Amino acid sequence: MRFSTLLKDLQTGEAELRWSQCGADPILAGAASLEQAKGDQLSFLEKGNALIAALTETGAGALLLPDQPDLIQCASERGIAFAVLANPRLAFAEALERLHPRLRPLAEIHPSAVVDERAVVGPGTFIAPRVCIGASSRIGANCIVHPGVVIYDDVEVGEGCELHANAVLHPGSRLGRGCVVNSNAVIGSEGFGFVPTPRGWRKMPQTGQVVLEDGVEVGCGSTIDRPSVGETRIGAGSKIDNLVQIGHGVTTGRGCALASQVGIAGGAKLGHGVILAGQVGVANRAVVGDGAIASSKSGIHGEVAPGEVVSGYPAIPNRLWLRCSAAFSKLPEMAKTLRELKRDISQ
């Protein structure tokens, strides 16, 4: 694809193409990082990116750049075709879709798949080998169900969903339109509910369901548990990384982002647009307000106000945590000073 042709496609996207200099108008066969790109590949750079130095050595045939004069000058002097955009990263994502279009499998049900006669599979849907679909389940139109997926009874999957190899959807699970469940993720597994008795732990039946609203994506090996009653609900457009555990009865708002190894205990509530970085833990029934952000390994107990950024365990406002961290490194010196003061006083 010619760079100029790609830019015409990007003009209709959301990345706000401002102007371009196509030069020799290279033919692009793909895309790569700035350090690894070759003459037939596209790359990009964001404003203030630490890789700016790599621009002087990149072998990329074309670049997507922010409106930053030094970057534009460098690309011009090196004779690299480029385009200036308000959001180069978004433009790069759109470009990848055009440079590497996905091949959609034919709509068919493989002979080795086991589909209950009471299940319904919508038109245009592909069911791969060794898929199991239980009674009264409904798979919407234009879905892709990869090998080894297990869909229990009474599951609903909306239009345009993709279920990757060995994903499992337990009874009563509900997926909206355009959801993606990656390999080995488990939706609707039993919540961790037990009642202590003199004879040991009594199991609490988990009769609820999990609901993924439209556009939710769940990473590999992540689990979302169903509650004893009611539902666990993930808000529309939320993105869940690999190896995330979401407990029974949790609710999240729209557009949340949960990084790898996040753990959310039962009954916790997340508002819209919440971001939890890697290994964040959220305690039982904690409440996180709209737009709040928790940095890696934060432990959230109680309530986080809307828009607040928290860090540490237990989680505290990020600015306070930074001050505490700075003081922590000085503790040995402070302890030494304190011992000297005590010795001087005792004399």
UniProtKB/Swiss-Prot annotation:
InterPro entries given in the database record: Hexapep, LpxD, Trimer_LpxA-like_sf, UDP_GlcNAc_AcTrfase_non-rep
Gene Ontology BP terms: lipid A biosynthetic process
The keyword Repeat appears for this protein: yes
Membrane-spanning parts: none
Domain of life of the organism encoding this protein: Bacteria
Active site: 248 (proton acceptor)
Cellular-component GO terms for this entry: carboxysome; membrane
Matches recorded under Gene3D superfamilies: Hexapeptide repeat proteins (2.160.10.10), MurE/MurF, N-terminal domain (3.40.1390.10)
Pathway membership, UniProt: Bacterial outer membrane biogenesis; LPS lipid A biosynthesis
Key words, A-Z: Acyltransferase, Lipid A biosynthesis, Lipid biosynthesis, Lipid metabolism, Repeat, Transferase
One Gene Ontology MF term: N-acyltransferase activity
SUPFAM superfamilies per UniProt: Trimeric LpxA-like enzymes
Catalytic activity: a UDP-3-O-[(3R)-3-hydroxyacyl]-alpha-D-glucosamine + a (3R)-hydroxyacyl-[ACP] = a UDP-2-N,3-O-bis[(3R)-3-hydroxyacyl]-alpha-D-glucosamine + holo-[ACP] + H(+)
Known EC number: 2.3.1.191
Function: Catalyzes the N-acylation of UDP-3-O-acylglucosamine using 3-hydroxyacyl-ACP as the acyl donor. Is involved in the biosynthesis of lipid A, a phosphorylated glycolipid that anchors the lipopolysaccharide to the outer membrane of the cell.
PANTHER family documented for this protein: UDP-3-O-ACYLGLUCOSAMINE N-ACYLTRANSFERASE, UDP-3-O-ACYLGLUCOSAMINE N-ACYLTRANSFERASE 1, MITOCHONDRIAL-RELATED
Assembly and interaction partners: Homotrimer.
Family in the record: Belongs to the transferase hexapeptide repeat family. LpxD subfamily.
Record's protein name: UDP-3-O-acylglucosamine N-acyltransferase
